[in-house]
Amino acid sequence: MYLSRFKQSGFRNLAPLNLEFDPHVNVFLGENAQGKTNLLEAIYFLAISRSHRTSNDREMIAFGQDFASLAGRVHKRQLDLDLRIVISKKGKSAWVNRVEQARLSKYVGHLNAILFSPEDMELVKGAPSLRRRFMDLEFGQINPEYLYFASQYRQLLQQRNNYLKQLARRQASDQVLLGVLTEQVATAASELIWRRYRYLADLNRYAAEAYRAISGQREELRVLYRPSAKEITAADQPAQIKQKLLDRFAEIADDELRRATTQLGPHRDDLEFQLDGKNAHLFASQGQQRTIALSLKLSEIQLIKQLTGEEPILLLDDVMSELDQNRQAALLNFIHGQTQTFITTTDLDSISQEIVKQPRIFYIHSGQIIEKEEGLNGRRR
């Protein structure tokens, strides 16, 4: 799978673009705050209909514009696709081969993308919300059902929280309605948690392989799901998960009324990374943390390939300078030239010429993008 053409207008600070990409490696060179990250965000949004930087879609519409439009041509083994997504103040609309999709869950998955940014280095020791967002962004693009239940859960959770606030303020008193909302939240939550366990089982295998390949060590990396309802296990089916959630909701009913918010569920769950059984949050060095984060991204590539039969595109946002040459080599050798890769950098010297021999290079300045005529080694393309 690769993206051959990309067009956009009205997205953040980017000038209107119509770019052709190399099927292998594309490098975007420019100083900070010139639009490199915005460009990768736009490509990522075209793929999964969400930003990795904000949950407010309106932020991505350029000042003075009514909407932002993103479009691309995707080549797969069996077919070519034209994708388009429009962000307006009313919401999002998406098209595949000029046919508007009834739901975004029908659109997501036609172009798979893995993005690796400096913020991902915080996956191990950062806030739990980073790890939950990691799961939702990555698992959502490989399974429409996950995306559907995640969206449904967010809506139901908001409704339940709003009603808990009304009860706390004595603006409502109907406990039957609270019971209905609790049942609905538990149903959506159980489906979401069950799918997280399933995908993490596969992700674990690939992440362990990637960690050993990058580090050259025999340490075993494991990724564990830590549900906020501790009674839930990986062996549970959705019906069992739902019942355990309902039992816990009954136990904490008074506390939730006092706090006026839902105290357990997927929005409170977390991931734990272990090296040889030790919690990496507590014991991992900075180098080990970076290797764990990188291993996760590489395992996502393998997982998507397993489930779809296609390599996703890989977006590396200013991370090459964060990696030493050995980790750079491990990263690019791991994808072995079959994954279309987009790299942003402020300095071409941060990218080893031995690793990336003939990329297509673009300059970015004040949102304007032009192609450089020479490769990394100075030869004309």
UniProtKB/Swiss-Prot annotation:
Gene3D superfamilies: P-loop containing nucleotide triphosphate hydrolases, RecF/RecN/SMC, N-terminal domain. It is found in: Cytoplasm. ATP binds at G30, E31, N32, A33, Q34, G35, K36, T37. Keywords: ATP-binding, Cytoplasm, DNA damage, DNA repair, DNA replication, DNA-binding, Nucleotide-binding, SOS response. InterPro entries: DNA-binding_RecF, DNA-binding_RecF_CS, P-loop_NTPase, RecF/RecN/SMC_N, RecF_2. It comes from the Bacteria. The keyword DNA repair applies. GO terms for molecular function: ATP binding; single-stranded DNA binding. GO terms for biological process: DNA replication; DNA synthesis involved in DNA repair; double-strand break repair; SOS response. The keyword DNA damage applies. GO terms for cellular component: cytoplasm. Pfam families: SMC_N (PF02463). Belongs to the RecF family. The RecF protein is involved in DNA metabolism; it is required for DNA replication and normal SOS inducibility. RecF binds preferentially to single-stranded, linear DNA. It also seems to bind ATP. PANTHER family: DNA REPLICATION AND REPAIR PROTEIN RECF. This is DNA replication and repair protein RecF. It comes from Lactobacillus delbrueckii subsp. bulgaricus (strain ATCC BAA-365 / Lb-18).
